[in-house]
């Protein structure tokens, strides 16, 4: 194992000089072995500058780091604990426990930089994953072993939606889950831990956090740490759920690291390697013949602009996109999913069946027509519409309200108990509204209910 010395420190970027015959490889993990506060600090090699000098990114605070400190080369990339020992534990980017519950006690470690499964090893599945959330199951159904993105600006409910998905899927799904908190709030990580503990599924979840107060190196690599843990479960033949909150912070950390390394920025100031970095992560999140990884990723949309390079690059890798709209949230309709913007590859009559496809298509057609008529209504009023258009508007308003749903994880704020709606009930409810079966029920009865039966019951109570 070779040793070198720190020759330059610029924030999180540290240059280390080694003898010419033992220069570390790119991505090798180095460790500060000198005296002081930085003893044990891990550095990851990013570039070889020549003359035995390597440029590294610190995986922790570089406060107190100085030139001349001794650095040891581990000879391999960062390794993290994997396997059942990680379940119920909270770890940092290096796989070290941060929950004060003692050592992990793992039997095996994986390196965080791994090749994606080969083309022959990958497998596709068209099996649907029921979420219990009406708007998602109807308009943008999830595939088991697929990749899903939750897109939305600040404060429209990405994390709450993700928590509800974890609550509904992780409880109903007997498999294991891995949660990677990438550059998000520490408070949310804390809430998530207690949420899992209260629901009794903590022993099925491994948590990896690199929160927003951490250096960019941690935030850039923590998604790979979580993914490595998920890959181990998949390779053992299990079906695993991988939740990443938030993939945008992964991109942002890459931007910070890129700037620190002196690379020329590209469009909107992002790193020139944006597409490649995203591809390296996303290509590994895949299902093989032995097991599956179903991934749900929250994607922050800067300034609500879906054409921003970061969300635009993420779109290409996903099977389903759930777009959260500020306009829908402002109407008080939660989850604020935009049924006209959200898409899924699974919404195909050969996959979901003809009835589901027709109902979803019908809902989107009615909502689109209502959107077009809004300007006419605003200027001339409802009286100027034809009878057919009036009927369509009334049904569209009922559909809009019926797309809302009380969440289990939001019970504390709303005071109304959460509802899980089966796919069969969802299709039955929307089909009934489209066919005019519930034209006699006032639109208020459809707001914040589960199944259509609850809406009917609510209307009868009001009479």
Curated annotation (Swiss-Prot):
Classification via PROSITE patterns: ATPASE_ALPHA_BETA
Localization terms from the record: Cell inner membrane
Key words, A-Z: ATP synthesis, ATP-binding, Cell inner membrane, Cell membrane, CF(1), Hydrogen ion transport, Ion transport, Membrane, Nucleotide-binding, Translocase, Transport
Enzyme Commission number(s) of this protein: 7.1.2.2
Alphabetized GO MF terms: ATP binding; ATP hydrolysis activity; proton-transporting ATP synthase activity, rotational mechanism
Pfam family, any one: ATP-synt_VA_C
Domain of life (superkingdom): Bacteria
Protein residues bound to ATP: 152-159
SMART domains on file: AAA
InterPro entries for this protein: AAA+_ATPase, ATP-synt_VA_C, ATP_synth_F1_bsu, ATPase_a/bsu_AS, ATPase_alpha/beta_chains, ATPase_F1/V1/A1_a/bsu_N, ATPase_F1/V1/A1_a/bsu_N_sf, ATPase_F1/V1/A1_a/bsu_nucl-bd
Topological relation to the membrane, as annotated: Peripheral membrane protein
Gene Ontology CC annotation, any one: plasma membrane
Catalytic reaction annotation: ATP + H2O + 4 H(+)(in) = ADP + phosphate + 5 H(+)(out)
Record family assignment: Belongs to the ATPase alpha/beta chains family.
Function: Produces ATP from ADP in the presence of a proton gradient across the membrane. The catalytic sites are hosted primarily by the beta subunits.
Record's subunit section: F-type ATPases have 2 components, CF(1) - the catalytic core - and CF(0) - the membrane proton channel. CF(1) has five subunits: alpha(3), beta(3), gamma(1), delta(1), epsilon(1). CF(0) has three main subunits: a(1), b(2) and c(9-12). The alpha and beta chains form an alternating ring which encloses part of the gamma chain. CF(1) is attached to CF(0) by a central stalk formed by the gamma and epsilon chains, while a peripheral stalk is formed by the delta and b chains.
NCBIfam families xrefs: atpD (TIGR01039)
Protein name: ATP synthase subunit beta 1
Organism the protein comes from: Shewanella frigidimarina (strain NCIMB 400)
Phylogenetic classification of the source organism: Bacteria, Pseudomonadati, Pseudomonadota, Gammaproteobacteria, Alteromonadales
């Amino acid at each position: 194992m070779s040793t070198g010395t720190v020759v330059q420190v610029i924030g999180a970027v540290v240059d280390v000089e080694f003898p010419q015959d033992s220069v570390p490889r790119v991505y090798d993990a180095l460790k500060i072995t000198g005296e002081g506060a930085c003893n044990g600090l891990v550095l990851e090699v990013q570039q070889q500058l020549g003359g035995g000098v390597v440029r590294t990114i610190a995986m922790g605070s570089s406060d107190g780091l100085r030139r001349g400190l001794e650095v040891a080369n581990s000879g391999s990339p960062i390794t993290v604990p994997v396997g059942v020992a990680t379940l119920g534990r909270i770890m940092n980017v290096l796989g070290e426990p941060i929950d004060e519950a003692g050592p992990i006690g793992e039997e095996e470690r994986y390196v965080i930089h791994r090749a994606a499964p080969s083309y022959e090893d990958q497998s596709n599945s068209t099996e649907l994953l029921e979420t219990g959330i009406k708007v998602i199951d109807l308009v943008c159904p999830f595939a088991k072993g697929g990749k899903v993105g939750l897109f939305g600006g600040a404060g429209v409910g990405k994390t709450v939606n993700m928590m509800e998905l974890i609550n509904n899927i992780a409880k109903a799904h007997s498999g294991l889950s891995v949660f990677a908190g990438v550059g998000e709030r520490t408070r949310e990580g804390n809430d998530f831990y207690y949420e899992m503990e209260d629901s009794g599924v903590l022993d099925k979840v491994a948590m990896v956090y690199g929160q927003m107060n951490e250096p960019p190196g941690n935030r850039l690599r923590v998604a790979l740490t979580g993914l490595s843990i998920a890959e181990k479960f998949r390779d053992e033949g299990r079906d695993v759920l991988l939740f990443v909150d938030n993939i945008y912070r992964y991109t942002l950390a890459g931007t910070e690291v890129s700037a620190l390394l002196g690379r020329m920025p590209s469009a909107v100031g992002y790193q020139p390697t944006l597409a490649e970095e995203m591809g390296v992560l996303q290509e590994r999140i895949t299902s093989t013949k032995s097991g599956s990884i179903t991934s749900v990723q929250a994607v922050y949309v800067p300034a609500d602009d879906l054409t921003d390079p970061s969300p635009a690059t993420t779109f290409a890798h996903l099977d389903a996109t759930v777009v959260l709209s500020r306009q829908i949230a402002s109407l008080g309709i939660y989850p604020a999913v935009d049924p006209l913007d959200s898409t899924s590859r699974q919404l195909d009559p050969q996959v979901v069946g003809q009835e589901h496809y027709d109902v979803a298509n019908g809902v989107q057609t009615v909502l689109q027509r209502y959107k077009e008529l809004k300007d006419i209504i605003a200027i001339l009023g409802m009286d100027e519409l034809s009878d057919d258009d009036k009927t369509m508007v009334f049904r569209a308003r009922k559909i809009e309200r019926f797309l809302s749903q009380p969440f289990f994880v939001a019970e504390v704020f709303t005071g109304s108990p959460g509802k899980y709606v089966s796919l069969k009930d969802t299709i039955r409810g929307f089909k009934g509204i489209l066919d005019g079966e519930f034209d006699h029920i006032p639109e208020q009865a459809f707001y914040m209910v589960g199944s259509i039966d609850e809406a009917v019951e609510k209307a009868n109570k009001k009479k």
